[in-house]
Amino acid sequence: MRILFAAAECAPMIKVGGMGDVVGSLPPALAKLGHDVRLIMPGYSKLWTKLTISDEPIWRAQTMGTEFAVYETKHPGNGMTIYLVGHPVFDPERIYGGEDEDWRFTFFASAAAEFAWNVWKPNVLHCHDWHTGMIPVWMHQDPEISTVFTIHNLKYQGPWRWKLDRITWCPWYMQGDHTMAAALLYADRVNAVSPTYAEEIRTAEYGEKLDGLLNFVSGKLRGILNGIDLEAWNPQTDGALPATFSADDLSGKAVCKRVLQERMGLEVRDDAFVLGMVSRLVDQKGVDLLLQVADRLLAYTDTQIVVLGTGDRGLESGLWQLASRHAGRCAVFLTYDDDLSRLIYAGSDAFLMPSRFEPCGISQLYAMRYGSVPVVRKVGGLVDTVPPHSPADASGTGFCFDRFEPVDFYTALVRAWEAYRHRDSWQELQKRGMQQDYSWDRSAIDYDVMYRDVCGLKEPTPDAAMVEQFSQGQAADPSRPEDDAINAAPEAVTAPSGPSRNPLNRLFGRRAD
């Protein structure tokens, strides 16, 4: 099956949030199932210094009255084919924000749709978040391309209808107040990035005023848990760490802790309880909750706190002042550094995610993989990935709290600090987290079922043989009988520059360009 991802990010080249991790890691797992997965994304100027890109574009066209070119490259890690939409509007260093953000991503979505119609025609066009939300609308009456829309964060919903009408053409049948709402209505299938988040967004508390619409389309909505790349995130082989370690031998983690303390200017103490946080510094992530409890925690315990991230200026200022008040006990780096983030995962004893809401969260998976015990709020994907620790029966992998209140968070932190005093049981807790399997392989089977469903194909049974095949890293047989109709379809070829073959244009007697 031919699957085209359309997204604004792809790790490791361009990553701002969890969407970049998903887009960079899910395709290889889908390829193991026999799918041909490719990506189209904006051609950000910084990519030209990170990737080997075709000298000449493979296609030129225009849309929204503007010319663009498409270049081809390969993912540096997994070899996935990537198509870059080249235009000066993507030259600035910023990825998000700016006065032209709405036009920028609507233009990208339109270019991606034109590419799918004219150059490489997929069976499924998989769109990610509001940046690609108009694609399901334009594809709605094309019977040859099915659309899947993934909600990574419902809070960000894109431009409103009145603005869309000014910057592009909206089909007469289009409904929905903004890009996100339109995508939810017109995508053939919709998924959220965790089962719990898929349920939460149908309530008024987490629905961001779209709960009514999400209940209306609930028949095509499902939750599929995110995963992580276990090869890229492996404490036994991670070259960014001063010492490697595993669940069977944690001695290297102690070395990482000392190096982290030295590098961050903290007191070098093996017995200190080090809390790590790698996050966008925004209200969603509960940074304000940390600021409310940190002074008391540092005053009454031997805790140390390390924070890495950028975001809201007010929260950055609050963290900077906290570090100034507790020199040697609290360190804040207001930037993003991949190597330093890995050192924090490896060198911290516990990891903080006191989120207001959390669609899935990937940081807690990295933390557990590196032996850092998560302290999380019971919300969204954190519910699905961090079962609460129970000393009575030695179960669970982290410390959880319910309400978004300082006293609840503080209580969870004290519980974690007290548990750290009992080193033998703490190491068992670390090992349980490190042994969890949150690879993309199992999630890929769920996506495979969804793709087959939307294309009207028979769903394969994820039996023991398939799971075993995945665990050995083998690719599935792409010539399964039920796939014959789709696999027999001719490969698309590079199309010449020229008029769009958008079927809606033929239907309405107009051109998208």
Curated annotation (Swiss-Prot):
Q: Which reaction does it catalyse?
A: [(1->4)-alpha-D-glucosyl](n) + ADP-alpha-D-glucose = [(1->4)-alpha-D-glucosyl](n+1) + ADP + H(+)
Q: Which InterPro entries match?
A: Glyco_trans_1, GS/SS, Starch_synth_cat_dom
Q: In which pathway does it act?
A: Glycan biosynthesis; glycogen biosynthesis
Pfam families in the cross-refs: Glyco_transf_5 (PF08323), Glycos_transf_1 (PF00534)
The UniProt annotation puts the region (Disordered) at 470-513
- Return the EC number: 2.4.1.21
Q: What class of enzyme is it?
A: transferase
| A molecular function (GO) term | alpha-1,4-glucan glucosyltransferase (ADP-glucose donor) activity
User: What UniProt keywords apply to this chain's record, in alphabetical order?
Assistant: Glycogen biosynthesis, Glycosyltransferase, Transferase
Biological process according to GO: glycogen biosynthetic process
- Which sites bind ADP-alpha-D-glucose? K15
HAMAP family attached here?
Glycogen_synth
Its job: Synthesizes alpha-1,4-glucan chains using ADP-glucose.
Instruction: Indicate the family of this protein.
Output: Belongs to the glycosyltransferase 1 family. Bacterial/plant glycogen synthase subfamily.
In its UniProt entry, what is this protein called? Glycogen synthase
Q: Could you read off the lineage of the organism from its UniProt record? A: Bacteria, Bacillati, Cyanobacteriota, Cyanophyceae, Synechococcales
Recorded name of the encoding gene: glgA
